[in-house]
Amino acid sequence: MKGYEVNFDGLVGPTHHYAGLSFGNEASTKNRNNLSNPKLAAKQGLLKMKALADMGMKQGVLAPHERPHVPMLRRLGFTGDDISVVAQAMRYSPELLSSLSSASPMWTANAATVSPSADSQDERVHFTAANLNNKFHRSIEAETTSQVLQAIFKNERHFVHHEALPQVALFGDEGAANHNRLGGDYAKRGIQVFVYGQQHLNNGLPGPKRYPARQTREASEAIARLHRLDDAHTVFVQQNPDVIDQGVFHNDVIAVSNQQVLFHHQHAFLNQDQAFAEIRQKMASIGEDFISIEVPENRVTVDDAVATYLFNSQILTRPDGGMTIVVPEESRQNAAVWSYLNDMIQMGTPIDAIQVYDLRESMRNGGGPACLRLRVALNETELNAVNPKVLMNDQLFMTLNQWVDKHYRDRLAQEDLADPHLLMESRMALDELTKILGLGSVYPFQK
C-alpha cells in the first residue's frame, strides 16, 4: 500500500505578538515588544502550505488555540465575566496576560509526537500531545491540541490518542521537534530517533549550563512505550549540550530528517559516531541505507545555523522521487549558509532542489518552516480516514485567506491584548474556523 508524509501546519492565531517568552530561543528574546502583524503572519503560513500542496505534497491545517486563555486566568484567581478577567490580568500582570495570549500553538512541531502504524505493534497511528512543561505559556496547550487532533484523526481503528505525559520536569516533552523518523517508503517500517537534552534520573551525565534542556530521555522513553515501538527499531540520542547553550533549544534547530537522509550540523549530537553506528545498523536491519549529510563548522557555524534556521527546514520527497529542502528567507540572506546550500545540491546527495519562503513574522518569534509543521506518515487507507476538510486545496486556501482578511488585525502590541474587542474578535474567528475545518466544539468557550 502506498505511503505519504502529510505535513499539518499550524495556522497562526489572531493574538500573534512578540512577548519574548521563550528563554533559550534567541530570536524570541531579541524581538520582545516589537509590533507584530497577525494578518501577515497567517498569510505567510498559508502561502507555504499552498505552495507545498501545489508541488504535489499532502498538506493539512491545524487550527490555532483559544487566546487569551481565560480558563487559566480564572484558575489564577481573576474573576468576573470574561472581559473583566482579561482587564484585571492586564492591570495586575500584563506579562501574565501576554503569556496566556501567546499564539505559540502555531508551532505544531511541538504539538505532539506521532508514530506511524508501520512501526507500532498494534498497527495503528499513535499520537501523544506534548506537555511542553518547560514553558508556562506552552504548558497549557496539550488539552486543546488533543481535542484538535482527535477531531482530525477520529477513526479508532486507525488512530490512537494518548494523554500528555505528567506535567513535571522529569517528563518534559517537546513533541516532534525532538523526534526524527528514518526509513524508506512512508508506509513501511522505519527507525524512530528520539533526541533528548538531559537525563534527569542520571545526574552524572553532561547537560547544558546556560539554557534549559527541554526534552528528557525519560519522556522520550515513555512515548516509545506508549506508542508500542520495538526496541530493535528505536534509537535514543543525546543532543550536544554545548549547542543547547548556543540557542539550539530543540533538535529541529540543528538537524532534520526525511526517509534515509539526516541533514545535521557537525556538532549536533553527543557521542555522534556511536549514535550513528547504532542508526546505521538498525537501518540495515530494515534493508535501508543511512545517509548522513553533515555540515561542517568551518562552512556554517552553529551561530549562523541558529540565526538563519538552516536546519529548521523541511526536506520533502517530491512526486518525481527527488528531494527539495524548504528554507526560510533568512537562509538566503546569509552568504555562508546560501553558499553551502547551493554547493550541497551539486554534491550528489538526494537533496537536489531548494525552495525559499518568507516566514518573517514566525521567524522573529523563533520559529522556521519546520517549527510550523507536524509530520504524520500515513498509508492510503489511513489518509482516507482523515477529516478531509483540513486538507489544503484551492478552495480551502481561498476560504482561509478570506477568513483571515475578515478577522485578523494587521498590527498588535502588548497593550492591545486587554482590548475586549480582541477577545471577541478571536472567539468569533475560531468559532467560524471550527465550522470551516469541521472540527466541532474544541475550544473552552464553545462548551
UniProtKB/Swiss-Prot annotation:
Does the record carry Hydrolase as a key word?
A: yes
Q: Which residues form a coiled coil?
A: none
Q: Which domain of life is it from?
A: Bacteria
Disulphide linkage map: none
**Catalytic reaction annotation:** N(2)-succinyl-L-arginine + 2 H2O + 2 H(+) = N(2)-succinyl-L-ornithine + 2 NH4(+) + CO2
- EC? 3.5.3.23
Biological pathway: Amino-acid degradation; L-arginine degradation via AST pathway; L-glutamate and succinate from L-arginine: step 2/5
* Molecular-function GO term, any one: N-succinylarginine dihydrolase activity
Keyword annotations for this protein? Arginine metabolism, Hydrolase
For biological process, the GO terms are: arginine catabolic process to glutamate; arginine catabolic process to succinate
Matches recorded under Pfam families: AstB
Tell me the residue numbers annotated for binding substrate: 19-28, 110, 137-138, 214, 252, 365
| Active-site residues, record numbering mapped to chain | 174, 250, 371
Q: Does the keyword Hydrolase apply?
A: yes
Q: What does this protein do?
A: Catalyzes the hydrolysis of N(2)-succinylarginine into N(2)-succinylornithine, ammonia and CO(2).
NCBIfam families recorded:
arg_catab_astB (TIGR03241), PRK13281.1 (NF009789)
Subunit arrangement?
Homodimer.
- What family is it from? Belongs to the succinylarginine dihydrolase family.
Q: What is this protein called?
A: N-succinylarginine dihydrolase
Gene name of this polypeptide: astB
